[in-house]
């Protein structure tokens, strides 16, 4: 548990590398780590807390308990019998969680250690990049239930695998393998199941050792710049760059290079 954050009922938090990396684990393995209303509320709360004050955390790793299912999507047992109003009210919770996550200034690595279906794949798509087990499957199955992806799936998946492939995946609802996900560029690396989280933590440590303001500005520039006309995006990148010129870390980085030592970045 990370003592600087509250205890959650549906999430486990573990601090790594002297508090620079936070491992966030979805913790409802008895129901395939499916999202219920409480999990949505707790995730939103955590993302908002990290946005306001990260307490020194420079990188997140998101994974799940149980090892077989990363996340099965929304808890359909909880949704069974919901009125239209109850359904929409719950989905607003999931929407707020989604927007809070994609607006996180610090990077999030998804360590997808089990099957990721529906909303489970959608939250994975909200991560900055993914590592996955080599024996799992992904799917957006919403059309088989009379709905459609509603937490970024129709926007994030095409940006990851291309529009035509995303249409086939979403319109058929058919699952695909981690090997296919790697081939299509959805996941960066695939590993043996027991190695996924450790590999993600290792990469998180590397990211956390870099200048945190530089990492944040890089994430911001890529995310927002990719939605702009190219020339505007170039200028947006320069504005992000210019914010780093007047920082202590910029001075420290150049000084450390010339002194042939490892820099000590403080995020100032």
What are these regions (language model features)?
Residues 1-20, 51-55, 67, 173-179, ...:
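C-terminal alpha-helix plus adjacent terminal tail
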Residues 24, 28, 43, 62, ...:
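Terminal peptide-recognition signature
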Residues 1-63, 81, 99:
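Conserved CoA-thioester-binding segment of acyl-CoA-metabolizing enzymes
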Residues 6, 19, 55-57, 74, ...:
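Structured loop/turn residues at beta-strand edges in well-structured enzyme cores
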Residues 39-43, 90-93, 123, 196, ...:
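Hydrophobic alpha-helical membrane-association signature
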Residues 44, 64-99, 116, 146, ...:
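Glycine- (often His-adjacent) and acidic-residue-rich active-site loop
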Residues 34-37, 72, 81, 171, ...:
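Phosphate-coordinating loops and pocket residues in cytosolic domains that bind phosphorylated ligands
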Residues 102-213, 243-247, 251-255, 261, ...:
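Crotonase-fold acyl-CoA enzyme core
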